[in-house]
Amino acid sequence: MQGRQSRNHFGLHMPNLQFRLAACYGGSNMAKTAPKTTPQIVLDKKTLKKALAELAAADPDIARALDEAGHPELRDMPTGFGGLMRSIVGQQVSVHAARSIWLRLEAAVPSMEPADFLAMSDEQLRAVGLSGAKMKYGRSLATDIVEGRISFDSLHELDDAAAIAMLTQAKGIGPWTAEIYLMFAHGRPDIMPGLDLGLVVAAQHLKKLRTRPDAKRLLKIAEAWRPWRSAAALVLWHYRRNMPDWGAPRSSAKTEKKAT
């Protein structure tokens, strides 16, 4: 995975999960020392509408993106082991391949419960299309959940940084994967995946920057979008997909295609 960028099964750009994380997030201990809080707002259809209105009022560039490319829609992702395992399946493969593997895995483990996944043999998991590394990541994640190191019940009590710290204990779950999971599976409203290439490219064009911003600069730009950075990320992804030539939008730009 080193030095590579790829799209995952959501059509988002998954970065190298080991890419200078300390520089981007202010050090490896930041999330571990974050206080516990309970997020009060969930990004749903109603709050997304409110978020987009507030973002457009506060940032003319966001208003322009919404006018030119249309409004984004929310994306769905399973919660729990299934959601994180789906992210692992989607790492470093095409959208089509990830979907095929995931459907076979769902058929083999209908409950998508950690204990049932652990009961599968390597041969069975290999037969559905999982690589050796992804089997290892899946087993590690399932074990962490079964043994209580990752608790989805307590996840709701943690602020974003602490939740990311908990999830990234598992092998194969880096900050980007954890952030995407919290955004789409739990509706966390104020997350900006600073390592996402799609967001970087969109922000460069939206803000008319001469060069692509690094993660640190993107996060600095995104400070102006609090407390709706997740909604701003949806705007940027949608803007990039519907303005491929950064000229006239596609004829279907006003209708967001549901992520797969």
PLM feature spans:
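Alpha-helical scaffolds flanking conserved acidic
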Residues: 49, 79-83, 119, 163-164
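Basic polycationic patches enriched in arginine
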Residues: 4-7, 20
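Short, amphipathic alpha-helical segments that act as regulatory/interfacial helices
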Residues: 85, 102, 139-142, 233-236, ...
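Alpha-helical scaffold segments that form or flank carboxylate-/histidine-based iron centers
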Residues: 77-92
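C-terminal accessory module of base-excision DNA glycosylases/AP lyases that mediates lesion recognition
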Residues: 23-72, 175-260
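Alpha-helical ds-nucleic-acid-binding substructure associated with the helix-hairpin-helix region
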Residues: 42, 61, 65, 93-94, ...
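Short, Lys/Arg-enriched N-terminal segments with co-localized hydrophobic residues
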Residues: 11-13, 17-29
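Short acidic alpha-helix initiation/capping motifs at coil-to-helix transition points
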Residues: 42-43, 78-81, 115-117, 156-159, ...
